[in-house]
């Protein structure tokens, strides 16, 4: 049944169900149990389990994506759309693997790494994950702050304060249980999707060219490869692989293999829908940038400049939609990043920082960037490249653990999926290695 303790294994504080809120949780638990028993079908069966993939999908629409996708569309038009599509497909596979790992084992990825890997590897993964968390929050926090500043005509520092307050307000919903927090994040996901649907309707598109470059791989030059690696780093997020496996634990527990298989099917469907929306948003970002900037400003690389250029090219509505999407993305992804950081520390170190302490630690680099006068967009793009280097660690760990019979039992990954997931991991590691070689040559 739904956990009733004050702390879940994934490290989140859950509401005290001894209060009268327990009575309000019963219908949701009953609906979930009915779905697992096969007494509910269709959308009604899926709804009680919606949440983990929706939260994880925010990581695929964070401000780092805005920065890299604007560069991709402005510099290369539609020619890197296939990278976005491929990265999204890989993300679906690995998020489904992460959710399955949590459902089958009852533990999150970080906990399993601690249990099954040597201590030096565990320490290395934890340190790399914390660096990735700071790099992630750098992009998320700066993106939200920049949007606040431009939308409300505030100094950037004031935008940072406003973003911090908005993030804390959403995190405070966790005290009421995971459902209110999930509902708030789902609403923000809907806002981002609606904004970019509006952008596509405003910006004229060459749909034939977009369809062609969606399926025909092209890397025009070395700079395009760097952006492609950044797209992968911005699209497939290390922290969401840890987080998703943890989020599956705070829900109703299957009582037998039949219910477990149903739960995994529901999880896979949610992954496809939630990350399908994230993929649409990322494709729309590149297409909007291609339409607005490729012909007139191919060197566009600054989010602030992109906003100011959008208004004369596509009209004020396009500029407002862009900022609302960026603001929503920055605030929501910052919340999710904090949640993921809790899972990582609890899993690897068996320790928990308070949410507010973790929030303070991870936003410190963002304040440092502004204080030093660094270019905000360049810092955001650099953070995505950092993420692409950290990414292979949780991917390899997830691949190894998902294939082990002593961890997954009868649910261990079968050979065809091992080959696909292994190939994707090798490609990403190879791209990162090439990027390092190119940087020094």
Curated annotation (Swiss-Prot):
The keyword Cell membrane applies. GO terms for biological process: iron ion transmembrane transport. It is found in: Cell inner membrane. It comes from the Bacteria. GO terms for molecular function: cadmium ion transmembrane transporter activity; manganese ion transmembrane transporter activity; metal ion binding; symporter activity. This is Divalent metal cation transporter MntH. PANTHER family: NATURAL RESISTANCE-ASSOCIATED MACROPHAGE PROTEIN 2, SOLUTE CARRIER PROTEIN FAMILY 11 MEMBER. The keyword Ion transport applies. Belongs to the NRAMP family. Keywords: Cell inner membrane, Cell membrane, Ion transport, Membrane, Symport, Transmembrane, Transmembrane helix, Transport. H(+)-stimulated, divalent metal cation uptake system. GO terms for cellular component: plasma membrane. The gene is mntH. The chain crosses the membrane at residues 41-61, 74-94, 116-136, 141-161, 183-203, 223-243, 271-291, 311-331, 360-380, 381-401, 419-439. It is a multi-pass membrane protein.
């Amino acid at each position: 049944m739904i956990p009733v303790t004050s702390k879940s294994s994934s490290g989140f504080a859950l509401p005290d169900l001894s209060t009268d809120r327990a009575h309000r949780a019963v219908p949701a638990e009953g609906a979930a149990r009915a779905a697992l028993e096969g007494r509910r079908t269709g959308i009604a069966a899926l709804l009680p389990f919606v949440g983990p993939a929706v939260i994880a999908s925010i990581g695929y629409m964070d401000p780092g994506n805005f920065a890299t996708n604007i560069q991709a569309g402005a510099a290369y038009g539609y020619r890197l759309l296939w990278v976005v599509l491929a990265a999204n497909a890989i993300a679906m596979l690995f998020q489904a693997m992460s959710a399955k790992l949590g459902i089958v084992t009852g533990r999150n990825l970080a906990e399993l790494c601690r249990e099954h890997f040597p201590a030096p590897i565990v320490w290395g993964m934890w340190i790399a994950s914390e660096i990735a968390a700071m790099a992630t929050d750098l992009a998320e926090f700066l993106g939200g702050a920049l949007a606040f500043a431009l939308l409300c005509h505030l100094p950037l520092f004031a935008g940072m304060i406003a973003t911090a307050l908005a993030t804390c307000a959403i995190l405070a919903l966790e005290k009421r249980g995971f459902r209110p927090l999930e509902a708030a994040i789902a609403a923000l996901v809907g806002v981002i999707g609606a904004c970019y649907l509006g952008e596509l309707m405003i910006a004229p598109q060459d749909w034939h060219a977009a369809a062609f470059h969606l399926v025909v791989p092209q890397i025009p030059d070395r700079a395009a490869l760097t952006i492609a690696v950044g797209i992968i780093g911005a699209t497939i997020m290390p922290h969401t692989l840890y987080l998703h496996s943890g989020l599956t634990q705070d829900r109703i527990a299957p009582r037998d293999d039949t219910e477990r298989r149903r739960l995994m099917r529901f999880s896979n469907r949610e992954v496809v829908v939630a990350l399908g929306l994230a993929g649409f948003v990322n494709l729309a970002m590149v297409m909007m940038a291609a339409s607005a900037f490729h012909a007139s400003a191919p060197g566009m690389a600054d989010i602030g400049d992109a906003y100011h250029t959008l208004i004369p090219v596509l009209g004020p509505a396009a500029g407002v939609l862009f900022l609302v999407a960026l603001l929503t993305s920055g605030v929501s992804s910052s919340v999710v990043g904090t949640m993921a950081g809790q899972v990582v520390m609890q899993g690897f170190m068996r320790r928990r920082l308070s949410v507010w302490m973790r929030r303070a630690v991870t936003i410190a680099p963002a304040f440092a960037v502004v204080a030093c006068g660094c270019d905000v967009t360049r810092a955001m793009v650099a953070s995505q490249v950092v993420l692409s280097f950290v990414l292979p660690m949780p991917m390899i760990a997830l691949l190894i653990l998902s294939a082990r019979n002593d961890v997954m039992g009868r649910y261990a990954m079968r050979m065809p999926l091992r080959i696909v997931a292994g190939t994707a991991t090798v490609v990403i590691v190879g791209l990162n290695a090439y990027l390092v070689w190119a940087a020094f040559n």
